[in-house]
Amino acid sequence: MTRFIFITGGVVSSLGKGLASAALGALLQARGFKVRLRKLDPYLNVDPGTMSPYQHGEVYVTDDGAETDLDLGHYERFTGVPTRQSDNITTGRIYSNVIAKERRGDYLGATVQVIPHITDAIKEFVQADLTDEDFCLVEVGGTVGDIESLPFLEAIRQLGNELGPDRALFTHVTLLPYIPAAGELKTKPTQHSVKELLSVGIQPQILLCRADRPIPDNERRKIALFCNIKQEAVIAALDVDTIYQVPISYHEQGFDTQVLKFFGMPVGGEPDLSRWQEIVSRVRHPEGEVTIAVVGKYTSLLDAYKSLGEALTHGGIANNVKVKLDWIDAEIFETDGAIHRLEGVHGILVPGGFGERGTEGKIKAAQFARERGIPYFGICFGMQMAVIEATRHLAGLENAGSSEFGHPDPAVVGLMTEWSRGNQLEKRAAGGDLGGTMRLGSYDCHLLPGTKVRDIYGADFIQERHRHRYEVNINFRDKLEAVGLTFSGLSPDGVLPEIVELPTHPWYIGVQFHPELKSKPFEPHPLFTSFIRAAIEQSRLV
């Protein structure tokens, strides 16, 4: 019997509902329970795949090829449970599914309405594809009071009644702002937020109150009184110096204990949080520091690279060093002399991206790393830029480029017009839809014996997650290998280049996939662990 925990948010956005969900999932796991985490997103986009990174942040890709919210990355990193297409839904997808059913006549001529048809579809999603999970944690995106969230709130209200108190718990995340002039935390925003939630028929049983300092007992009593909950269920969600402290902090505040007590389940002994304590200790007490320059396109919004930043941190944890990230807009390197900003860094990483802006700056960064012997890690677009740089400056084809930016001669990177989804071969026509028309999800890759990546992975075959429309043209393999670049990872049929490396360089690797999506604090991705190790060696040379 799966129990459902619904997590909503109020007052303002970005209070940490996703981290709270992930942390609670980790705490329940530490007590021996099996969990699944889900996210309801209230925007009208079918998925975030075509949304601007400045609007949405990172698009997190699952093994089964779903383009989802970045909170699913937190879920995977904290619990280790792989997320799926069935763990993220948007208003756009719900409406699309309902309208498709109406067109097919599934509703037998009924008037299709938000209640019951949209809410029924949401409830069906929440409960679908569950097997033996003890708990399903469902985060509702947005803020209570937003018009977009109303169908989701109504759906979980109905579910709460249908499941009953022995299977449904409502947790609400709010803000307790500190007003310096008054010298105290203010509870009124929380009171009004709960009142707004009550107006749609939901009484929260647990409150997570974001605050930058401990909550005095008198304020807890006040919140409990006005919000109609037990005082011990007013949980302080305190600011911490590392997100890996969050599960420990929530346990100290009694979050997991209150959940079990609500469901009438035995609390038992203390959960084993030793591995979290070890991670926090490594983050707080590193033995050294390395600086990694991240040369990207969306560096003004770091949420666009959320998993990347975490994966680099994981590489630092594995090597017991602090990783200092220098986020650099690639466009600055298109001006004379700016490339010297990279002098003194211990590693250069060019992440994924789309579009022409900043392209030449990324190519210059790859060239700088290659010529100066600085560890270079190119991910997706970053691999393509490394290949273009090598084609221009090693193979002598000065006009080499990507067909993503026009009609270069030669186009060493080209559009994938055909690819396999399941057992069907698909082709994207010019002017067709962009949404979902990429190579998405987990694919096999064969690693060549004797290569650096073969040593790093310690395996002949790997599986990694992809999100791209363009690929390096395999027809340039011989020409590039003749000047020193090795195509060290290929698709099983040998057609698609997945990894390139420069054997004569201390650490120069480009990958077409996104390894950051599979890195976890307790299982750092081997490429990031190796990259940071190479950066440590570089730091001794600078």
UniProtKB/Swiss-Prot annotation:
It comes from Rhodospirillum centenum (strain ATCC 51521 / SW). Catalyzes the ATP-dependent amination of UTP to CTP with either L-glutamine or ammonia as the source of nitrogen. Regulates intracellular CTP levels through interactions with the four ribonucleotide triphosphates. Gene3D superfamilies: 3.40.50.880, P-loop containing nucleotide triphosphate hydrolases (3.40.50.300). Transmembrane segments: none annotated. NCBIfam families: PRK05380.1, PyrG. The active site is at C380, H514, E516. GO terms for biological process: 'de novo' CTP biosynthetic process; pyrimidine nucleobase biosynthetic process. InterPro entries: Class_I_gatase-like, CTP_synthase, CTP_synthase_N, GATASE, GATase1_CTP_Synthase, P-loop_NTPase. Pathway: Pyrimidine metabolism; CTP biosynthesis via de novo pathway; CTP from UDP: step 2/2. The gene is pyrG. Its EC number is 6.3.4.2. CTPSs have evolved a hybrid strategy for distinguishing between UTP and CTP. The overlapping regions of the product feedback inhibitory and substrate sites recognize a common feature in both compounds, the triphosphate moiety. To differentiate isosteric substrate and product pyrimidine rings, an additional pocket far from the expected kinase/ligase catalytic site, specifically recognizes the cytosine and ribose portions of the product inhibitor. Homotetramer. Signal peptide: none annotated. It comes from the Bacteria. The keyword Nuclease does not apply. Pfam families: CTP_synth_N, GATase. Residues 291-541 form the Glutamine amidotransferase type-1 domain. GO terms for cellular component: cytosol. This is CTP synthase. Residues 1-265 are annotated as: Amidoligase domain. It catalyses: UTP + L-glutamine + ATP + H2O = CTP + L-glutamate + ADP + phosphate + 2 H(+); L-glutamine + H2O = L-glutamate + NH4(+); UTP + NH4(+) + ATP = CTP + ADP + phosphate + 2 H(+).
